[in-house]
């Protein structure tokens, strides 16, 4: 097998759909006051994690991003961590 074909085959094997964490917990809407839930979607540097990492749907990702931004404005979450 050629090197490019092996690389492609390996990538196809490793791709699995992520499990949706909001669906697993039975959450339909994301609230900015739910600090523990929002911390799951923020990196150690304080950035919002991408859909590819979290496994959320596009609508849920928008809800999480809006909730995180609101929580930052209300001083429930830091804008960045050191």
Curated annotation (Swiss-Prot):
GO terms for biological process: translation. Residues 1-24 are annotated as: Disordered. The keyword Translocase does not apply. Keywords: Ribonucleoprotein, Ribosomal protein, RNA-binding, rRNA-binding. GO terms for molecular function: small ribosomal subunit rRNA binding; structural constituent of ribosome. InterPro entries: Ribosomal_bS18 (IPR001648), Ribosomal_bS18_sf (IPR036870). Transmembrane segments: none annotated. One of its GO terms (cellular component) is cytosolic small ribosomal subunit. Binds as a heterodimer with protein bS6 to the central domain of the 16S rRNA, where it helps stabilize the platform of the 30S subunit. Part of the 30S ribosomal subunit. Forms a tight heterodimer with protein bS6. HAMAP family: Ribosomal_bS18. This is Small ribosomal subunit protein bS18. It comes from Corynebacterium jeikeium (strain K411).
């Amino acid at each position: 097998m050629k090197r490019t074909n092996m690389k492609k085959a390996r990538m196809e094997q490793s791709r699995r759909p992520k499990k949706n964490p909001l669906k697993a917990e039975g959450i339909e809407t994301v609230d900015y006051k739910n600090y523990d839930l929002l911390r799951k979607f923020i990196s150690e540097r304080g950035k919002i994690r991408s859909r590819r990492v979290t496994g959320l749907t596009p609508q849920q990702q928008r809800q999480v991003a809006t909730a995180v931004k609101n929580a930052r404005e209300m001083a429930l979450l830091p804008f960045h961590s050191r």
